[in-house]
Amino acid sequence: MELIIILLALGLLMFTAYRGFSVILFAPICALFAVLLTDPSHVLPFFSSIFMEKMAGFIKLYFPVFLLGAIFGKVVEMAGLAASIAKTIVRLVGAKRAILAIVLMGAVLTYSGVSLFVVVFAVYPFAKNMFQEANIPKRLIPGTIALGAFTFTMDALPGTPQIQNVIPTSFFKTDIYAAPWLGLMGAVIVLAAGMLYLESRRKKAQASGEGYGGFDSQNAPAPESIESAAEPDKSPIRHALAFVPLILVGAVNKYFTIYLPKWYPNGFDFSSIGLKEFGRLDISSAAAIWSVEIALVIGIITTILFDWRSVFAQLKEGLNEGIGGALLASMNTGAEYGFGGIIAALPGFHKLSSGISHTFTDPLVNGAVTTTALAGITGSASGGMGIALSAMSEQYLQAIQAYNIPPEVMHRVISMASGGMDTLPHNGAVITLLAVTGLTHRQSYRDIFAITLIKTAAVFAVIAIYSLTGLV
């Protein structure tokens, strides 16, 4: 019965999200419905101490990132960078390769350490312009951004600084370059299969006469796109400079990620300036977020300098729109985190995670299935991985020693598995992506789910490759 309660709450949230209802309202309703069926007396304590704590904690940490990311994306659009870069890339790779261009743009940003939430805000203006230029249906944008930002650069490519690749290092005493060949092969599988799928969807839409805005827009881009954006100078230098803010965001983020902890080697003690009530701040936990925020501020300033007249002409409307988008996206994602927190606290969840973890004898398969299942249930790659490793890491270490499996292989498998079924309809990144693009689950989730299946299958392909070749 306890398992049925969890599945019922999860199914209800997926259904309401798919039907277009706001998860800000339905995430707590679905979560508390599960608590009500478990023990009615726990409803109010769970709401105050778990749901609201999780939601508020997420917003406290990440709202500045959402806000600056949304403003950066909007300023990029207002300054004409989106139109300029879109035209340049279309000219280089061809209009028919707009999908590949957006995938690679998202991949470069996430691999450079930019948060995938920021990538959604930053890449969407480019995707919108490029898809309009190539007359590719807008409904394919979420799947395209998902392939570039939510898959191989998040957890497969060795060296990626995303949290899904960092968490296993503390459990398996590895580094972020663990199992490089397996990671590279997994990345190639996801990229190749994902591109084949998205291109097949593009060709099918083209054959049926569907354009950017649907079946009534077979001709040129929508009027609000490239023609109405600030028209960039036609000189090659001007086009090249349009890439500078995007590159700066990645480079500055990397720089401050390395050097901020060195500037505060002992953290920051507020009592040293007479503010004892705030205690000591652990810089290691804040440096990653600070780095992104600084990088985005520099990116915004650089973008404004690119064409300050165009930006200031639309500044009020653009800022208001960006702030509104950031509020909606952060509240949506925070509500989903609160839902995951309540589900993870229910008695049925512990039975479920324990049951899954004891189903498979092979430690790699066991770890992959457990992690991806928990990521799917909680709607969070890092959340599912954290729960799996906190409960099972010692058992996994003993098992891989018994099977003579290097810990680096387990690291890569667990990392990739966390990014498997995490992108179900209630996932925060999915909800943010759809909110930013102005699309619904009904319009675009099919393609996101196809990418979800591809990246989940890639984990087991990597396990098979290791089992057959022993390659690490």
From Swiss-Prot:
Keywords attached to this entry: Cell membrane, Membrane, Transmembrane, Transmembrane helix, Transport
Annotated TM spans: 4-24, 27-47, 56-76, 99-119, 140-160, 176-196, 240-260, 286-306, 323-343, 372-392, 448-468
Q: In the record, what terms sit under GO molecular function?
A: gluconate transmembrane transporter activity
Q: Residue ranges under compositional bias (Low complexity)?
A: 220-229
Report how it sits in the membrane: Multi-pass membrane protein
- Ranges for region Disordered: 209-229
What superkingdom heads the lineage?
Bacteria
Could you state one GO cellular component term attached to this entry? plasma membrane
Task: List the cysteine pairs that form cystine.
Answer: none
UniProt-annotated location(s): Cell membrane
As for family, the record states: Belongs to the CitM (TC 2.A.11) transporter family.
UniProt protein name: Uncharacterized transporter YxjC
Q: Which organism is it from?
A: Bacillus subtilis (strain 168)
